Amino acid sequence: MSGTTGERPFSDILTSIRYWVIHSITVPSLFIAGWLFVSTGLAYDVFGSPRPNEYFTEDRQETPLITDRFEALSQVKSQSEIK
């Protein structure tokens, strides 16, 4: 004999006015917040990744490749030095 879990059926949730009122506000808000997070450059600052114009400097135009996995830290330090 099977019982119920006490949860609302998914079809009841999707046809609920309350569901659509809440989600019609939160989904666009999350989209706008994400767009602002990236477009203002805050995402670059928070995660520490270089901005698109900082990948290549005037002095260093080659691609910085790590070739030795055991000396990777020293290679990263030498490639990130400002010359």
From Swiss-Prot:
Domain of life: Eukaryota
Cofactor(s) essential for the protein: heme b
Membrane topology recorded in Swiss-Prot or TrEMBL: Single-pass membrane protein
Keyword presence, Heme: yes
Gene Ontology terms for molecular function: electron transfer activity; heme binding; iron ion binding
Cofactor note: With its partner (PsbF) binds heme. PSII binds additional chlorophylls, carotenoids and specific lipids.
Main location: plastid
Subcellular location: Plastid, Chloroplast thylakoid membrane
Residue sites binding heme per the record: H23
Family, as annotated: Belongs to the PsbE/PsbF family.
Protein name: Cytochrome b559 subunit alpha
Naturally occurring in which organism (per UniProt): Oltmannsiellopsis viridis (Marine flagellate)
